[in-house]
Regions:
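Short, ordered coil/turn segments that flank beta-strands lining enzyme active or ligand-binding pockets
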Residues: 20, 75, 124
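C-terminal lobe and adjacent flexible extensions of AdoMet/dcAdoMet transferase-like proteins
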Residues: 88-135
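Short, glycine/charged-enriched secondary-structure capping and boundary segments
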Residues: 5-8, 39-42, 123
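Short glycine-/acidic-enriched loop or helix-start segments at secondary-structure transitions
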Residues: 3, 35-37, 118
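A short, flexible beta-alpha/helix-coil linker loop
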Residues: 1, 77, 113-114
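SAM-dependent methyltransferase
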Residues: 25-96
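A short glycine-rich, Lys/Arg-flanked "PGG" loop and its adjoining helix->strand segment in the class I
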Residues: 6-23
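Surface-exposed cleft-lining segments at the edges of enzyme active sites
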Residues: 1-5, 81
């Protein structure tokens, strides 16, 4: 979302929907990744004709937000331009947010697209992180 407050509200509402000892499993952008890599180069490397493309990337180290313009083409050939604002989180932030919401067990792993596993330790090479939290 556009603000950290909006993201917190999403986490809070998801938490309210869980039963006691329920698990909340999600992925989020890994804040360690842009400290060691260019987000723009990452998007360019994954660019495939027919898929969305990103341009005008700027990463703000003070807010850990990536601002970019994403262009997509729908099935009818109509081009759309989206002004994006994406938040990256470091593990300590996610842990603190979840502890604030009452989670007792929080695990964070590296997220490999389509092959999520608790065996993957989170590193700066992972674009996303897998979070498993229990109330």
């Amino acid at each position: 979302m556009e603000t950290d407050e909006m993201n917190y509200e999403i986490l809070k509402n998801a938490t309210k929907s869980l039963k006691e000892h329920g698990k909340f499993i999600f992925t989020t952008l890994n804040g360690l990744f842009p400290l060691y890599h260019s987000v723009e180069e990452f998007h360019d490397a994954g660019s495939v004709e027919g898929n969305a493309t990103c341009r005008s990337n700027t990463f703000d180290l003070m807010t850990f937000r990536d601002y970019n313009i994403t262009e997509v083409e729908d099935d009818d050939g109509n081009k759309k331009e989206l002004k994006c604002n994406e938040r990256y989180y470091v593990p300590s932030e996610i842990s603190w947010l979840l502890k604030t919401l009452g989670y007792i067990k929080i695990e964070i792993f590296g997220a490999k697209l389509g092959a999520y596993s608790r065996n993957d330790k989170l590193t700066s090479e992972d674009f996303e992180m897998l979070v498993v939290a229990e109330k």
